[in-house]
Amino acid sequence: MTDFRRLFLSVFIAFLLIFSTPSAYSLPLPITENTSSEFLNLGVDQMRRGNYNKAIENFNQAIQLQPDFTVAYSDRCLAYLQLQDYYQAVTDCTQAINLATENVEPYLNRGLAHYRQGNYLAAIANYNQAIALKPDDFRAYYNRGLACAGEGNYPEAIANYNLALTQIPQTTSLPLANIYNDRGLVRFELQDFAAAMLDFDLAIRLNPQDYRAYFNRACACGRNGDNFGAVRDFSQVIRLNTSNALAYVNRGVASYRLGYHQKAIADLQTASEYFGHQGNRVAYKKTLDLLKSLRQQIQLATEIA
């Protein structure tokens, strides 16, 4: 049977918009510094509003007036990350690092750009630098864990997630949930389903509104043969994210295995409609093929009976 299982990966980077704080001088500040700082602040404001192209325009002005403005390069890097222009993000982070080698943020963000490009080894190298500069920053361990998982080095990924858990403030429930969710994914890949379930349970307890952990726990239930648990969790995914076609497919498969044939057919029909509306032609065709196969199997079972 077609395996529609998809596990979700959550990348957490605390994008820190950096503000420049003018130092106290006995003499008036140069006009250029004031103006560049104003452009920087305008850019930061546009970032907060989600206007990333406008933010870049302001950061460009700040850099034109002050070519060694480290903060402007760092913040422009963040804007490019949001626009998924990873080449420019790497370029700006590199310039920020050249201007201030002891600043952790550009290493974290350049690592993220490399990670999203699929260049996991380069990402790991940047996170190593960040950890050397700031050994108590959980983000570097967590992101290095993600990159290790991308490389398929699951034991090292788990080790980094564990280190992140030792450094993260226990009051930050959403980042904690992400770490447990991603550690659960790695344990799932290692077929340690019991440990994966425990991590997904913790992720759900910390963030009960995140459908991804329910989806992942449902997949683990299915692999354990717990189709009732799979139906329960896929149903919760659908309650939280009504257009999640994959959840309908997987709930349909679990329902079929439980003998609820009409519910299975209804879910697959709904899934095909969502895939069609979303323009996902490959998934749409595969769902129709699966629907046809299930109907044939149901008909055959009826004839034999």
What is each of the regions a protein language model found here?
Residues 2-305:
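Alpha-helical tetratricopeptide repeat
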